[in-house]
Amino acid sequence: GGGLIGLTTAMFLAEAGQTCVVFEKGRVGAEQSGRNAGWVRQQGRDVREVPLSIESLRLWGETSRKLSNATGFAVCGSLYGLRNDAELQAYAPWMARARECGLAFEVLGADGVRRIAPGLEREFPIGLFTPSDGRAEPELAAPAIAEHIQSLGVRVVQGCAVKGIERSAGAVSAVVTERGTVACSRVVVAAGAWSSLLLRSLGIRLPQLKAMVSMAKTQPFPAGHQSSIWVEGLSSRRCADGRLSIEHGGRYVADIVPDSFRYLRDFLPVIREQGKDMKLRLGRRMLTELGYERWWRRGGATPFERERVLDPSPVAIVDAVGPTLSRVMEGHDQVQYTDRWAGYVDVLPDAVPVISHAAAVPGLTVSTGYSGHGFGLSFGGGRLTADLVLGRAPIVDPSDLSLSRFS
């Protein structure tokens, strides 16, 4: 896959002297790697992700310096605005884990919140702030990494879908693409929202669904906040050109598709806990995905060839974000949208990625399910994936990220 996970994995493998090919059915970074909020954060993560997020931010900085900052990476800090101590206590596990890992953060009062985002303190008088967090430009990052790794000798083949993975004596032996078969001894599946479908063709079960998030960019606000901001109903990141990339910060659309029923038992706890933030939708997506395996069985084009890029249309909830921005922060009146878009993110039941060997298929490594957190984790995730492929000491302990937890 030619998203950031696949590209960074190839980068670290190439730096270790390996010969790599990246196959992308569409264009590099055309799906969730290029459609996300652009946060590179350590703050507020699941405790299992904290060590990886720390390493990832370090690698973002190192690589961006090598690339003359072609990714748009910058350290800016992340601020979560909170209404009361009860909301702050929801982050107690993360704060404890951050302290264990030596990650500096601050709990701010109203004056501290106002210093970072004037006006926010009126509704959100408590802040959780991690000053070392960063941001980058999603539309720039994947193409920049793709160009860089080609200079290292990696072949990046766009517009070429992988149709399947061949095995000999149970182990990986080749990748079958629409342009031919490539013999190999190691394969990494970093196919984002398409990973579960590809793995199922190998008899591997991965409970993965798609969630659709709608986003927008505003006109430039030269005097606006510099840190990335999250409050209930608003996520805001400053872009390199002074515009703000905004989204609702919690609401998403879940299309009802065949996998919704296939993995219903796995996701029931999520539905019970987060149902208020989830809009279920039954429509064209169901018909499209009903045809997936029928096309495959009949020997026709695979789903990966039929649908090169997931390109959903944004929904109306993004219209409410601009007024929220104007209400809660000073100096952001008369918000105008210059762009709107949407993207699917792949989600797992526990919202923590799988970075793991597939025990049932020797030579196969899986790196997927980043659950909307993958942009910031991409460099750490790619490095850890490469470590597993190479059999060297991993950058962090991968045991909590094992595929076997869904067995």
Please describe what each predicted stretch is.
Residues 1-3, 25, 191:
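Glycine-rich Rossmann-fold phosphate-binding loop(s) that bind the pyrophosphate
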Residues 5, 28, 194:
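Conserved Rossmann-like nucleotide-cofactor binding loop
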Residues 5-8, 12, 16, 107, ...:
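C-terminal lid/capping helical subdomain adjacent to the catalytic/cofactor pocket in oxidative enzymes
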Residues 8, 165-293, 304-315, 319-333:
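Flavin-dependent oxidoreductases
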Residues 14-34:
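Glycine-rich FAD pyrophosphate-binding loop
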Residues 38-112, 116, 233-236, 241-247, ...:
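Dinucleotide-binding Rossmann-like beta1-alpha1 core, especially the glycine-rich loop
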Residues 51-54, 80-90, 128-147, 157, ...:
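Short beta-strand to alpha-helix junction loop
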Residues 128-186, 193-197:
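Helical element adjacent to the flavin cofactor pocket in flavoenzyme catalytic cores
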